[in-house]
């Protein structure tokens, strides 16, 4: 592994980094590598505990694992950096189910997928790094290519997947429903997960947008999601977070009017630094949408709606960008305008949603489910990053050995934006190839740092 790292680091000082990196093709592939894993033998370790009390630090381990053989259409990537997504938190606390059920199901699909069904799960759904090897049939990518990976793994043998790959019955989230994920020194991806690394970003910055940026793009911009247009009022929950931070940027870029909901003055300030003018600090304003565990408070829905109208000059949201789930969903359905759209992915506060259906059917609103993104949507979202139109939201980074702590902070909402993880990269700030473009956007790139 040291030879691989030295070859990649040589590109840092080279006038021709592409030439340096092409030399990776001549290096042997290590027989094993370090990865962040959960273990099947520990899948019941948190039984009987409340979700909040489950500690990712106890379940995530860094261990040496064998390097898998490449199947046709796959690539082996030396991972310089990755990031924490909420699906890594779910994996680490074995909720809503153990991910070993996903690996077992995938392993039954074919002889090639059987290698995913192991007593350990290498996790992680983001990666930035350098291609080391490609399997048979891969023509677009070659050893030495600097890449980022999106997390849709799809077989594409079903006709439905050729309309929209997210509709393929064999689509899975890499590093969550498949093995050999990105929180590791090496990862295995399908070639159609790869995209060019934005040249003005460091490794940890380039790794961070992947899952959440693509998810926000489909959910908000794509015709498969809310199909946002100029002038739309968009209510964004968690607007300074890993997902909401990208939704806020896309709303601003697209001429929409974001109403950013956050939970602290610091998070409100981050939204303003992104350019948002309309911000609700729901903690400071005392919004409590549930009276107790069983009873919602429609009076609080109404108060939120009044606050939104106060900020917008009397307008209700055309779009509600939902992802907290149980805690906020009743309010989301209520505050959307007549004919408006509640577009939802994830459910970080709970999967069982309750809302008053009268405000949906009688006001002709619609709920749209959105899940990650297809390759085209992910590519377009990455293009916005590469052009400097959308910026990473990395607030802090950890070395691979401290991935458990990074996941713990995301679980406890003790973070802003995205939390990065350095895998092979020894320090932050490496991998920048376009200094001129970076200089134009330095402030925006770093606005989440240190928060």
Locate predicted features.
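NAD(P)H dinucleotide-binding glycine-rich loop of Rossmann-like/cofactor-binding domains
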Residues: 110-119, 125, 153-238
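Helix-to-beta-strand junctions that scaffold the AdoMet/dcAdoMet cofactor pocket
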Residues: 229, 336-337
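Hydrophobic/small residue at the entry helix of a nucleotide-binding pocket
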Residues: 215, 242-243, 327
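Adenosine-nucleotide cofactor-binding segment
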Residues: 236, 252-327
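Glycine-rich beta-strand-centered segment in the early N-terminal region that forms part
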Residues: 66-83, 96-158, 198
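Rossmann-fold NAD(P)-binding glycine/threonine-rich loop
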Residues: 347-363
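A short N-terminal beta-strand-loop micro-motif at the entrance of redox/enzyme domains
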Residues: 11-26, 43-81, 120-122, 137-138
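C-terminal hydrophobic helical "lid"/dimerization subdomain
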Residues: 2-31, 330-334, 375-451
């Amino acid at each position: 592994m040291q030879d691989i790292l030295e070859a990649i680091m040589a590109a840092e000082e080279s006038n021709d980094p592409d030439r340096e990196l092409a030399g990776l093709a001549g290096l042997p592939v290590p027989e094993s590598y370090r990865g962040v894993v959960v273990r099947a033998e520990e899948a019941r370790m948190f039984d009987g505990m409340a979700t909040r009390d489950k500690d990712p630090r106890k379940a995530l381990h860094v261990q040496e694992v064998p390097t898998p053989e490449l199947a046709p259409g796959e690539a082996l990537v030396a991972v310089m950096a990755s990031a924490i997504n909420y699906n890594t938190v779910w994996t680490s606390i074995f909720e809503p189910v153990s991910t070993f059920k996903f690996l077992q199901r995938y392993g039954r699909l074919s002889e090639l997928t059987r290698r995913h069904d192991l007593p350990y799960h290498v996790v992680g759904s983001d990666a930035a790094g350098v291609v080391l090897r490609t399997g048979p049939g891969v023509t677009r990518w070659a050893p030495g290519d600097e890449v980022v990976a999106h997390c849709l793994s799809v077989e594409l043998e079903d006709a439905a997947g050729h309309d929209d790959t997210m509709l393929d019955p064999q689509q899975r989230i890499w590093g969550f429903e498949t093995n050999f994920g990105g929180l590791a020194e090496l990862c295995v991806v399908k070639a159609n997960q790869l995209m060019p690394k934005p040249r003005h970003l460091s490794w940890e910055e380039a790794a961070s947008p992947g899952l959440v940026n693509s998810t926000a793009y489909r959910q908000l911009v794509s015709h498969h999601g809310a199909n946002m247009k100029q002038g739309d009022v968009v209510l964004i929950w968690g607007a300074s977070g890993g997902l909401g931070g990208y939704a806020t940027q896309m709303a601003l870029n697209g001429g929409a009017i974001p109403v950013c909901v956050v939970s602290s003055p610091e998070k409100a300030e981050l939204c303003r630094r992104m350019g948002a003018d309309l911000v609700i600090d729901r903690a400071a304003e005392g919004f409590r949408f549930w009276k107790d565990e069983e009873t919602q408070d429609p009076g609080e829905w109404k108060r939120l709606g009044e606050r939104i109208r106060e900020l917008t000059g009397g307008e209700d949201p055309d779009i509600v960008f939902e992802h907290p789930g149980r805690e906020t969903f009743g309010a989301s359905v209520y505050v959307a305008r007549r004919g408006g759209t509640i577009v939802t992915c994830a459910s970080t506060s709970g999967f069982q949603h309750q809302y008053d259906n009268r405000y949906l059917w009688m006001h002709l609103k619609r709920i749209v489910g959105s899940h990650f993104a297809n390759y085209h949507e992910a590519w377009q979202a990455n293009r916005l990053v590469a052009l400097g139109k959308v910026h990473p939201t990395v607030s802090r980074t950890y070395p691979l050995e401290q991935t458990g702590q990074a996941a713990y902070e995301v679980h406890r909402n003790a973070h802003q934006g995205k939390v990065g993880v350095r895998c092979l990269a020894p320090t932050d700030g490496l991998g920048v190839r376009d200094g001129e473009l970076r200089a134009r956007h330095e402030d925006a790139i770093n606005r989440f740092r240190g928060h």
